[in-house]
Each structure stands twice: as C-alpha cells, then as structure tokens.
C-alpha cells in the first residue's frame, strides 16, 4: 500500500533570480533590453515575489505573462512596468485590459 505524503514544497531564493538576471545582462550588449517572463505563477515560484524583485532592476523593461489573468495579478500587486501577454486573450478580458501598460 502506498503511503500518503504532502505536496512538494519549493523555496525560491529571490537573490538567485536576481543573480541569474545579472549574469544574463553581463552577456548582452549594454543597449539590449530584457523582459522578465513570469508565467504559470513564476513557474510555480510565485509571480508576485519574482516580479517585485525584477521591478527593482533598471535593465528589466517589463514582464511577459501567458494570460491576461496573470497580467492583472501583477498589475494589482503594484508592479508598474509594461506587461506583454504571450497567449491568446479572450474577448471577455478586453475591458479589464484597459489598464495602462498591459499590451
């Protein structure tokens, strides 16, 4: 018989996220703009905490999400940089996307 176990827990070191972005920036030309892809709840690590760290980085010019709902979560959390929605946006979401800088 299988034993019951709890859900998997993953702790994200936000300083490691920033370090990864720093390393990528070092490999690019100075005029290259970067965008933080924060979809699927930051790939399961929490879109808002990851986004808040990326918000502090001047070379990150915005974010990308998979859905309109994810974009709205970032905006409602107070993130100010532009958000690009990568996936299909259903017409029902159009009225919610009149917030500035959601593309």
Predicted ranges, named:
Residues 43-60, 75-81:
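Glycine-rich loop at the start of a catalytic domain that most often binds anionic cofactors/ligands
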Residues 72-73, 79-93:
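Glycine-rich nucleotide/cofactor/substrate-binding loop typically near the N-terminus or early
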């Amino acid at each position: 018989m299988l034993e019951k176990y709890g859900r998997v827990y993953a702790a994200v070191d936000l300083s490691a996220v920033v370090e990864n972005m720093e390393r990528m920036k070092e490999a690019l030309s100075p005029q290259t703009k970067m965008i933080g892809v924060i979809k699927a709840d930051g790939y399961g690590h929490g879109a808002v905490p990851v986004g808040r760290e990326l918000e502090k980085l001047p070379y990150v010019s915005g974010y990308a999400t998979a859905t309109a709902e994810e974009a709205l979560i970032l905006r409602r959390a107070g993130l100010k940089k532009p958000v690009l929605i990568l996936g299909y946006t259903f017409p029902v979401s159009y009225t919610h996307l009149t917030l500035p800088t959601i593309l």
